[in-house]
Amino acid sequence: MKKTTFLIVGKHAVLEALKNPNRNIERVFLTEDTKKKLNRENQNLNLFKKINVFYKSRKELDNLCGRDEIAHQGLVAEVEQLEDITLKEFILQNKKNDVNLIALEEVTDPRNIGSIIRSAASFNLDGLIVKERHFPSESKLMYKSSSGAIEHLNIFKVSNINSTLKYLRDK
């Protein structure tokens, strides 16, 4: 069964998604100027080899991204959602005794969540616990705000934060 896809935008978000072996990229849209800029910056363009790449104008990318008014930086990718791992599975698979997690409750702004994800990844945290009802999992804005860090952090969606924290305390 084919998963649904969504768009992520921005240089860092798209390049990190391309580097993630667990992420399925359907296609990438970029401008000729962006391709030249990536070549000048010595970005590894081998990432684009096994992916459908479509060259578009900035106006076409603006239309593709919709009315979100997010700066796509000439680079957009259509991706599938990552496979979710449950917190219990992660705890069982994890070999180390100390697991460092951050829990968010009632944080719904995609920019704030993206910034928290970026900070959590920079501190090498193992994951982020979020309430599944309040997590904008397919938000272009969240992916862009995380600057691609979301590709390096486990996101655990739970129904009840309090019971999850009690479960973790008892482990």
Residue ranges and their predicted role:
Residues 1-92:
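N-terminal positively charged helical leader segments and presequences
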Residues 23, 92-171:
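RNA substrate-binding interface of SAM-dependent RNA methyltransferases
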